[in-house]
Amino acid sequence: MSNIRVRFAPSPTGALHMGGARTALFNWLFARQNGGKFILRIEDTDFRRSREDSAQGIVEGLSWLGLDWDEGPDIGGPLGPYRQSERGDIYSRYLQELLDSGQAYYCFCSPEDLQKEREEAAQEKRDYKYGGRCKALKPEEASEMLQAGKPAVIRLKVPLDGNTVVPDLIRGDVSFSNALFDDFIIAKSDGWPTYNFAVVVDDFSMQISHVLRAEEHLSNTPRQLLIYRALGLKEPAFAHLSMILAPDRSKLSKRHGAISVQEFENQGYLPEALVNYLALLGWSTGKDIDIWSREEMMREFSLEHISKSPAIYDLEKLAWMNGQYMMRLDIESLMALVEPQAQQQGWLNEDNFDYFQQAVELVRNRAKTRDELLDALGYFFEEVKQYDEKGVKKHFGQQKASTMLSEVLEIVSNMGSFSAAELEEAFRQRAQELKIKAADLIHPTRLALSGRTATPGLFELMEVLGQEKCISRLEKALDFIAKLTTHGPEGHNHR
């Protein structure tokens, strides 16, 4: 395809969420695959709700995801401005063109007049449509009322019969009866255009070839086509992306884990993983592949492979995918991911860098997210403050628990060197001497050293912790078991 120009046009009234990020990604992929341009436009004419910090957050979110744009409010371009709030003169010219051609008119009906019409429609049990009383006003009458300072909106004259067909590249032709529409407002009483008018003028004047956007905008598209045709402008191609639903097929919300892109970044998710996951929300090549590089996505992406059916958001799958990307990181990148938090916690300083690296290496495959990785690192740097409740019942609550840990303490105290291989050999030899399973020594030791029932391999864990820490924690665990035997299981905290 030639001269492909697509845009992502968010309203800065909140954060960049998953739906918006997916829309941006699909536009970006389509542009990059076809050698086209990806334009960022900020639709900020809702002056009451638009916020500059939201606009900045959206820009930062796209940058973090690696979705670079070719034209936009920060870098400019030949067809700007790229903020609607700076395009007032452009909109005014096109509005005047419609007024001059008789395809639009001023409406002076007051809110009270319109409310009365709505109430009459409700009483008669019919859908409300504007009655069109101002359509009959002569130009000189409208001019007199404007000069008198009477507030007015501008309405488009909509054909009373026929259909408006939306040719959709994903859904095929979608037909809307013109009888559904009234003469809808295209400019408010303050002179600023409504969304549907502004977006038509912007897309045409920025030479947008394809409009890829969420399915929720499909109902706006026939109104926009009516505006294109009234102005005699070339229409872009449209493709409406299916909705993203929660696992129970309800509307997606924060309670389903659908947080903003910035919140995912703050939680330490990797941008590559989020981009990969977003791409699979509604796009599939039919290949049984979950992990796609950006280059592979750009090569394979096509509108033909976008589903009409809703995509299902699955936070567990996203976490799994993030884990796959974390496993592929080299140790330096993985350490950089957790260093700020580790330093903040007081875990990392110039004296224990090697120890920190060994700990990260050991637990790296047990974490799907940065926060899980930090959680897995905790007991390497902080004393065990609480033992797992089920673990206490299973491994510390038995009469032999104290005996088992005493045996381990003796083994550990008498070790010359402290390698994982030598520790394992010593444990298994002692288990053989005591005619017990090695697991009878291993499980209570794991709980004593970490407070947990699941960790990386115990002997590797012990080697990293070091002999001194292991002895100290075994002694504390024995003390805890003694109190447990004396006082009963009132609680599992210890200081």
Curated annotation (Swiss-Prot):
Q: Where does it reside?
A: Cytoplasm
This enzyme catalyses: tRNA(Glu) + L-glutamate + ATP = L-glutamyl-tRNA(Glu) + AMP + diphosphate
Q: Which UniProt keywords apply?
A: Aminoacyl-tRNA synthetase, ATP-binding, Cytoplasm, Ligase, Nucleotide-binding, Protein biosynthesis
Q: Which domain of life is it from?
A: Bacteria
Question: 'HIGH' region: where is this motif?
Answer: 10-20
EC number assigned by the record: 6.1.1.17
Where is it found, in Gene Ontology cellular component terms? cytosol
GO BP terms, alphabetized:
glutamyl-tRNA aminoacylation
Task: Give the InterPro entries listed for this entry.
Answer: aa-tRNA-synth_I_cd-bd (IPR045462), aa-tRNA-synth_I_codon-bd_sub2 (IPR020751), aa-tRNA-synth_I_CS (IPR001412), aa_tRNA-synth_I_cd-bd_sf (IPR008925), Glu-tRNA-ligase_bac/mito (IPR004527), Glu/Gln-tRNA-synth (IPR000924), Glu/Gln-tRNA-synth_Ib_cat-dom (IPR020058), GluQ/Sye (IPR049940)
Say where the protein is mainly found: cytoplasm
Establish whether keyword Glycoprotein is in the entry. no
Query: Residue numbers of motif 'KMSKS' region?
Result: 251-255
Cystine residue pairs: none
* UniProt binding sites for ATP: K254
MF GO annotations: ATP binding; glutamate-tRNA ligase activity; tRNA binding; zinc ion binding
What is its quaternary makeup?
A: Monomer.
Instruction: Describe its function.
Output: Catalyzes the attachment of glutamate to tRNA(Glu) in a two-step reaction: glutamate is first activated by ATP to form Glu-AMP and then transferred to the acceptor end of tRNA(Glu).
The family annotation for this protein states: Belongs to the class-I aminoacyl-tRNA synthetase family. Glutamate--tRNA ligase type 1 subfamily.
The name this protein goes by in its record: Glutamate--tRNA ligase 1
Q: Which organism is it from?
A: Syntrophomonas wolfei subsp. wolfei (strain DSM 2245B / Goettingen)
